[in-house]
């Protein structure tokens, strides 16, 4: 099956630079036969908001410094990056935009490696939660847990009822179209700390009691990704430990996720360039590509 927007990332200079940036040395960093690597997923995979922008399809807000490109540079893989900002699981099998084919069209029997981050946009669950809690936080002056009080288990119920089965179906489709591939489903790095930090309110205007509430929603989403991966033979890449302390409330240079306000990214509440590099590095470590 023809590849879409296939990007050959096999230049020695580019691959060497990527390997050095991740601390990769020796033959493990470069396979003798380049991996046929397809990257799927949403804005966390696409690196939306991270410069430089991939000009091949501006609708997808894809960065050429996203974690798929870092992985490809570090391994010498042949990358077909079909990630797209705003993607939902349904966009694996449906066209997301005119001229943007279903993402799994990029897969075939020759695909060796697939990575993906997906599920956060399904039913608008996570963006709706962040928006609702941000609005409630501003209105409450950061006090109490107005978002939790109003929404209760609405968001986690949506994840369990809708997102989890959709994730499982999407991963099954990936497996059917790329039966010989290693499939890595990445969790989402922490957006909020475990407990409220009063100094963070100016950057992330979430009420103190809603910080753990939002984190619990994200934990449910990651659990759904993990369960789906385990049930379909994919590898789950867990960021719950390695991203601790690198949330949107951390200082610039430490955080992997940019805050809602005063973001250094073009797209807030998304990984910055450091976050994309760290997502790549941890994924390579889990997959034994380091």
Describe the function of each predicted region.
Residues 32-86, 104-105, 133-139:
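Serine-esterase "nucleophile elbow" of acetyl-processing enzymes
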Residues 48, 98-158, 190:
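Oxyanion-hole/transition-state-stabilizing segment in secreted/luminal serine hydrolases
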Residues 26-38, 96-115, 168-182, 284, ...:
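Short amphipathic alpha-helices and their capping/turn segments at secondary-structure boundaries
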Residues 1-31:
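Secretory targeting and sorting signals
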């Amino acid at each position: 099956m023809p590849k879409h927007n296939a990007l050959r990332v096999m230049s020695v200079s580019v691959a060497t630079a990527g390997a050095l940036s991740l601390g990769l040395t020796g033959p493990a960093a470069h396979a003798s036969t380049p991996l046929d690597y397809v990257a799927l997923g949403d804005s966390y995979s696409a690196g939306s908001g991270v410069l430089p922008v991939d000009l091949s399809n501006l609708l997808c807000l894809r960065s050429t410094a996203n974690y798929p490109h870092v992985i490809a540079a570090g391994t010498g893989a042949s990358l077909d990056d079909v990630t797209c900002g705003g993607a939902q699981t349904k966009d694996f099998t449906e066209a997301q935009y005119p001229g943007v084919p279903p993402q799994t069209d990029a897969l075939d029997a020759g695909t060796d490696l697939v990575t993906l981050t997906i599920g956060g946009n399904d039913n608008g669950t996570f963006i709706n939660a962040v928006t609702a809690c941000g609005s409630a936080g501003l209105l409450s002056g950061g006090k109490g847990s107005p978002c939790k009080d109003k929404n209760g288990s609405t968001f986690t119920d949506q994840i369990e009822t809708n997102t989890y089965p959709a994730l499982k179906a999407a991963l099954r489709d990936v497996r059917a179209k790329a039966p010989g591939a290693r499939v890595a489903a990445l969790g989402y790095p922490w957006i909020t700390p475990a407990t409220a930090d009063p100094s963070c309110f100016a950057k992330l205007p979430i009420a103190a009691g809603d910080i753990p509430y939002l984190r619990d929603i994200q934990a449910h989403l990651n659990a759904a990704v993990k369960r789906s991966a385990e049930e379909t033979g994919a590898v789950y890449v867990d960021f719950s430990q390695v991203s601790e302390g690198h949330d949107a409330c951390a200082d610039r240079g430490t955080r992997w996720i940019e805050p809602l306000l005063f973001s250094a990214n073009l797209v807030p509440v998304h990984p910055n360039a450091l976050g994309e590099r760290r997502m790549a590095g941890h994924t390579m470590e889990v997959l034994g590509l380091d």
